[in-house]
């Protein structure tokens, strides 16, 4: 399970070092294999262990592609999906199209979301968190049906 937010740097070649606390799980359960794609709703990337991505892929493939919205989702998520392998130093290489799509430069955030990571530019992450905090204190957030049943 991937938890927490880590501020990390992309090197000049577009590589990022996965924090050491996550590496054993990625290596043991997925032989260091990950898949990165874009988030269709947010300006970030989604980084899945290969086994998690294979489940997402099956869900995407099972959708009827006659629906233009579903076809767009498939096109974007599958079209950008790129396999990334941990190298000997625990780094992965993010392709140029992925980096451009998420506006990634040197300072980035790797954010654990239990079964996957989100990869954000640091500035986009800070803006999103600020927006989420404002929403969290609003009455709209409290009125969500799904949140009414959530016990933390």
UniProtKB/Swiss-Prot annotation:
Pfam families: MraZ
Cellular component aspect of the GO annotation: cytoplasm; nucleoid
Transmembrane segments: none
GO terms under biological process: negative regulation of DNA-templated transcription initiation
InterPro entries for the chain: MraZ, MraZ_C, MraZ_dom, MraZ_N, MraZ_sf, SpoVT-AbrB_dom, SpoVT-AbrB_sf
Main location: cytoplasm
Annotated compartments: Cytoplasm, Nucleoid
UniProt KW keywords: Cytoplasm, DNA-binding, Repeat, Transcription, Transcription regulation
Boundaries of every SpoVT-AbrB domain copy: 5-52, 81-124
GO molecular function, one term: transcription cis-regulatory region binding
HAMAP family to which the protein is assigned, alphabetical: MraZ
Subunit structure, interactors included: Forms oligomers.
Similarity section: Belongs to the MraZ family.
Name of the protein in its database record: Transcriptional regulator MraZ
